[in-house]
Curated annotation (Swiss-Prot):
Belongs to the UPF0250 family. GO terms for cellular component: cytosol. It holds the Pfam family DUF493. InterPro entries: UPF0250_YbeD-like (IPR007454), YbeD-like_sf (IPR027471). This is UPF0250 protein BCc_307. HAMAP family: UPF0250.
Length: 87
């Protein structure tokens, strides 16, 4: 999958992460903080709540300079204790 993704992307490019995690106020802030550390900028994440309000789906788009940047962000976002899945 990684090789296919590398071949499909031409850098720099926009790349959207969808992060699904527990519905806690600090989740969005933690996601933005990690992204700001790698790629400073203004971000406007789209946030959707699950039907029961247990989870949040947060979509955030970045401008990636290379594949390593995409992979590193994916790994760091996955380490947030409230995160259940990163797409």
């Amino acid at each position: 999958m990684t090789n296919k993704l590398k071949k499909m992307l031409k850098f720099p490019c926009t790349f959207t992460y969808k992060v699904i995690g527990l519905a806690q106020p600090e989740l969005t802030n933690n996601i933005i903080k990690i992204i700001q550390n790698h790629i400073p900028g203004d971000y406007a994440p789209q946030i959707k709540s699950s039907n029961k309000g247990t989870y949040l789906s947060i979509s955030i788009t970045i401008c990636a300079k290379n594949f390593k940047q995409i992979k590193n962000l994916y790994n760091e976002l996955s380490k947030i204790h409230l995160v259940r899945m990163v797409l």
